[in-house]
A protein has these predicted regions:
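A glycine-rich helix->loop->beta "capping" turn
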Residues: 155-166
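Conserved glycine-rich Rossmann-like NAD(P)H-binding loop of the short-chain dehydrogenase/reductase
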Residues: 114-130
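Canonical Rossmann dinucleotide-binding motif of NAD(H)/NADP(H)-dependent dehydrogenases/reductases
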Residues: 88-119
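The beta1-alpha1 cofactor-binding region of Rossmann-like NAD(H)/NADP(H)-dependent oxidoreductases
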Residues: 141-151
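A conserved hydrophobic alpha-helix of the Rossmann-fold in NAD(P)-dependent oxidoreductases
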Residues: 128, 149-156
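Conserved small-residue
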Residues: 24, 94-96, 142, 156
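Glycine-rich flexible loops
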Residues: 1-94, 106
Length: 166
């Protein structure tokens, strides 16, 4: 950013958005499931374009300045300025027990409203279908059963990449 920036530009988050997982494939990262899906879509198109270019005789990256100009395009900067700051818990992953009703459900809704994704655990099978959101994974589980609870935690970690709030 420092080598190419002009006055008035807002530095984008420099964290990687996707990575190669040797022997497995690729992993995409984002502050929300929607953001990760957008990264996955761009990554898929980029990989296909590179493969087609290689098949046609070769591919090289753009010079750093050209990549910077694309990333820091005036309209992209305007969009970022309008979007405002991220929600307080954006990028956080929560696990809530008793999430099908009462206090557990209220806590899950509050965490969602603050930007977290929620692994919602309850003995009630309805927890699976309570929310139609990619920020919610409902898991039928009896928290008194250690093996089932360990599997619930693994499900959340596999789906969202970690666990920050219990």
């Amino acid at each position: 950013f420092q080598r190419n920036a002009t006055e008035g530009l807002t530095c984008l988050d420099p964290a990687p958005r996707w990575a190669v997982w040797p022997g497995r494939g690729t992993i995409c990262f984002g502050r929300s499931p929607k953001a990760a899906r957008i990264v996955a879509d761009i990554k898929d198109h980029t990989i296909r374009a590179i493969q087609h270019a290689e098949a046609l005789g070769g591919w090289t990256t753009l010079p750093e300045r050209d990549v910077f100009d694309v990333e820091y395009w005036v309209l992209e900067q305007a969009k970022l300025a309008r979007s405002g700051p991220p929600l307080q818990l954006a990028g956080k992953i929560a696990l809530v027990t008793g999430a099908a009703s009462g206090i557990g459900l209220a806590c899950a809704h509050e965490l969602l409203s603050l930007g977290a994704v929620v692994g919602a655990v309850d003995v009630d099978p309805e927890v699976v279908h309570l929310m139609d959101s990619d920020a919610w994974v409902g898991i039928e589980c009896d928290v008194a059963e250690d093996v089932a609870m360990a599997e619930a935690v693994k499900t959340v970690v596999r789906q969202y990449g970690g666990l920050d709030i219990i």
